[in-house]
Amino acid sequence: MKPTTETYLNPTINDIARVAEVSLATVDRVLNARPGVREKTISKVNKAIAELGYVRDAAAANLARGRVYNFVFILPANDNEFVSSLQAQIDQLNINLRHDRTVLSFVRVAAFDPMALSAAINAIDKSQVDGVAIFGPETPSVRDSIAHLKANGLTVVSLVADIPSSERDYCVGIDNVAAGRTAAQLLGRFLGKKRGKVMVLTGSMLARDHLERRLGFDEVMGQDFPHIDVLASLEGRDDPDLIERLLPDALAENSNVIGIYSSAAGNEGLVRFFNSHNFDDKPAVVAHELTPLSRTALNNGVIDAVISQDPGHLIRSAVRVMRAKRDQRPLNSAQERI
């Protein structure tokens, strides 16, 4: 290998080939991880790349090969404004990325149904798709399906709710434990010295984001507001009709409910319930996701605070992560923080 005494401001693959003393074809094979190159030669090429400070122009390389990225999002199929906003962001970004050789699509599957989610993952055409972003529960069947995607060379991102025990490449979403802690701080301050009970609405105990929010919520309520009793989670499955039916009985069974924490995104049933009932002393309410419905409820005093995450940021971040992983480029972690 030739010593590098020259300064290369913008090194090219020709420079790599010259310094490593190999052919351009060999450099191309190494850069694209293709077979047929000896380990010793790969080491020489990688050493030349490091010494020259070569940074691959992935966009130019993809354009030269006519490559198109194909990314699929799997979303829950529930009646939920937050999920609908994610879908709308996918549609809009798909239009914006047409010039960037990137195609986005989505699949909707039954919410909180791990078998349906696994079936949707398994149905993906591995030969046509580069990456998959999954918003769904963490179960053994889902982990197995993700492992199958990885075995076929696809990039996998968990979206909103993490699936850490799987082989997923990255999680795009907020820190849900911290979100639960924030909800407890807000609700505790709203309630002050009042004694009573707090009801926790959740979508499903299968949903890791809901579980993590509950964990953070309980931690702060127990430490900072021990005079308030936190009730067991009421599972509404993000179904507005079910939530509207469950709330009257739950409030009748538990006297002196002074606060409600809605840890899921399905707030329609909660809002409908409060709009149709009168309270001498309405419970304070903290919810998740700023949507047209929750914004109106905030303005009307039905909801007292909303903890939000930006749907557009979530989708854009998922796409950036999947592209970076496919191109083997480093991530800007600060940019992907939701």
Stretch-by-stretch model annotation:
Residues N96-D100, N152, M221-I228, E253, ...:
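Short helix-capping segments at alpha-helix termini
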Residues A183-D224, P330-I338:
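An alpha-beta-alpha
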Residues R56-A119:
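Amphipathic helical "hinge" segments at domain boundaries
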Residues P140-A178, T291-N299, I303:
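Flexible loop/hinge segments that line or gate small-molecule binding clefts
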Residues M1-R67:
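N-terminal helix-turn-helix DNA-binding module of bacterial transcription factors
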Residues M221, D310-I338:
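Hinge/cleft segment of the Venus flytrap/periplasmic-binding protein
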Residues V132-H148, F217, L234-L293:
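Hydrophobic alpha-helical
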Residues P76-S84, S105-L117, E138, V172-T182, ...:
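Hinge/beta->alpha junction and helix N-cap segments in small-molecule ligand-binding domains
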